């Protein structure tokens, strides 16, 4: 996998090239290793306080997640995340949900409900602000022929990564969601 430092350089390069909207079809669920922090832990109790103090000062400089988050902040970047159909402990952070209908009316939508999620690290999702789910379900023969544009978690509705990127690209403030028993359309 690419380091978060490389991802930060990628975002900076794409923005410099004039790219309007960037989407990551991966979820950043775990922090990247911080070498300075690992050295502090590995040398704990060895008695070299000057070395430990030096490493402690370097911990923020070696925080690649923080560096990546600074590059995401204020940009049209959409991060991917995953929903789960079975109940499990939620992990990470979800982006803000879309307000298609008032929260108390969400149960009336014929939108598939997901039981749990694996979101991004808080530092990254807070910086990116936008997100879209990555879920797909292949047909019995293993081919993916369709994918939902929206899914629900609790009383909140979330977009697929593709729809979230489209919304950022065209700077749409609102989407209209029309659902039916057999499917849904977004206009």
Tell what function each PLM region has.
Residues 1-187:
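Non-transmembrane functional regions of envelope-associated proteins
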């Amino acid at each position: 996998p690419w380091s978060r430092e490389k991802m930060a350089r990628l975002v900076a390069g794409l923005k410099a090239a004039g790219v309007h909207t960037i989407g990551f079809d991966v979820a950043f669920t775990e922090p990247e290793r911080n070498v300075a922090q690992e050295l502090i832990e590995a040398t704990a109790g060895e008695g070299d306080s000057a070395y430990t103090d030096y490493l402690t000062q370097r911990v923020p400089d070696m925080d690649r997640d923080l560096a990546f988050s600074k590059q995401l902040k204020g940009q049209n970047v959409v991060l991917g995340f995953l929903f789960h159909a079975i109940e499990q402990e939620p992990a990470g952070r979800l982006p803000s949900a879309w307000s298609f209908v008032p929260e108390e009316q969400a149960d009336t939508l014929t939108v598939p409900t997901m039981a749990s999620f694996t979101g991004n690290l808080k530092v990254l999702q807070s910086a990116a602000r936008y997100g879209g789910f990555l879920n797909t379900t292949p047909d019995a023969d293993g081919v993916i022929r369709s994918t939902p544009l929206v899914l629900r978690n609790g009383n909140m509705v979330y977009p697929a990564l593709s729809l979230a990127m489209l919304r950022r690209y065209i700077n749409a403030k609102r989407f209209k969601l029309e659902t039916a028993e057999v499917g849904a359309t977004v206009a």
